[in-house]
Amino acid sequence: MEVIIKAKVKPTEDKYKVKKAILNIFPKAKLTFIEKDNEFGEWEGKTKSVEKLKELLRSQSILDAARMVLEKGMTENATKFYLNKQAAYVGAVNFDIDTHGGIFVKILADENEDIMKIIKDIAPRTKGGVIINEDELEEEEEKEDSEEIKEGHKEENNLKIKVIDNSSGD
C-alpha cells in the first residue's frame, strides 16, 4: 500500500502550518514543497503508514463515517478523499468536501493487495460503537438468509396442503 498526499498552500496560509496538518495525520510522510508561483505552492508526499489515521478514526468514534467516505472514493485499486486542513492541524480527522482547500489523500493498493481489505482495516464496521468482525457478520447474515428461505418453503408447502384440503372438501 502507498499513500499519496497533496495539499495546496493558499496565499493566506502558512506553508509550515499546512505541513504540520499533514504530519499530524501521516507522521511518517516524506513531504516536498513545490513552488507553483509567487502566490502559493503545494506540499506533496508519500507514506506507507496509515497507523495514525486509524488511531484517530477510532479515538474520534467516526469509523462508520470514515468507511462510507473510503467506499465512496473507491476505484479498482485505490480510494481517495479529502481531509480538512484546520481539523488536521489540531490533530483531528474531518472529511472535507472542499476539493480546492483540503488535504488530498489517495490510498493505492499494491498489485497483490485488495483495496477493500485495506478499507476494512482502516475503518472496520461497528455495531453499537463496537468494532465487529465482518467475516463473522457475513456468515451470520448468510445463515439468517438461509433460515428465512427454509421458513418460506415451509409456508409454501403449508399453503399447498391447505389448497389441496380445501379442494377435496367439495
Swiss-Prot record:
Composition-biased stretches, type Acidic residues, lie in: 133-148
Q: Where is this region: Disordered?
A: 133-170
Q: Which InterPro entries match?
A: PAB1135-like, Ribosomal_uL5_dom_sf
| Entries under Pfam families matching the protein | RNA_binding
Q: Which domain of life is it from?
A: Archaea
Q: Where is the composition biased (Basic and acidic residues)?
A: 149-163
Q: Which family does it belong to?
A: Belongs to the UPF0201 family.
Checking HAMAP family in the record gives: UPF0201 (MF_01112)
Q: What is this protein called?
A: UPF0201 protein MJ1564
| Phylogenetic placement of the source organism | Archaea, Methanobacteriati, Methanobacteriota, Methanomada group, Methanococci
